[in-house]
């Protein structure tokens, strides 16, 4: 349930139980910029909406023969460390993920939230492509801290891919949005985080 959360916070709730920050941070940015299709971004059934949007993007990449991007997404997701519950991503496949989404049809939000394998890794290039391909937004990727509003990528350890990228968040003004919450700074969200990339668009 949304409780007392703002609509902008509601956009990111799915990331509080799945690793889907590449999508939810993008949704937050799109919502803040008053982009259309707002019914996708908040309200009831948000888990199902998020999964449907991810499936649509993956199916679009398959239909358009974007095998390189699909391989990057698959490889990045396989590099996820096991979760606290022991969920392992080392055998993740795009087709298996789509099948899992298909099996989610008709399940309750509460049941879906428990399934950590709905997580998926989005390399920076894939986030930029998603904005362009699915939302017709020309995004700019900067592999350093620019201080600009946008989707920020952070690191906290020595993960092997994309400069240690471990999470995406949305920054607007002096606020950071992630996991369905609002923070006054990146360090308030996690003191170990440091910004390593910014994806901006208008």
Language-model segments: what does each one mean?
Residues 16, 20, 24, 122, ...:
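Short, well-structured alpha-helical interface segments that form or flank functional binding sites
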Residues 11, 20, 46, 50, ...:
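Extended aliphatic helical segments
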Residues 180-202:
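Conserved catalytic-core surface of thiol
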Residues 56-162, 172-174, 179, 189-193:
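Conserved active-site-adjacent core of cysteine acyl-enzyme catalytic domains
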Residues 167-171:
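Short beta-strand-centered aromatic/proline hotspots
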Residues 1-73:
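Active-site nucleophile-adjacent alpha helix/oxyanion-hole segment immediately C-terminal to the catalytic cysteine
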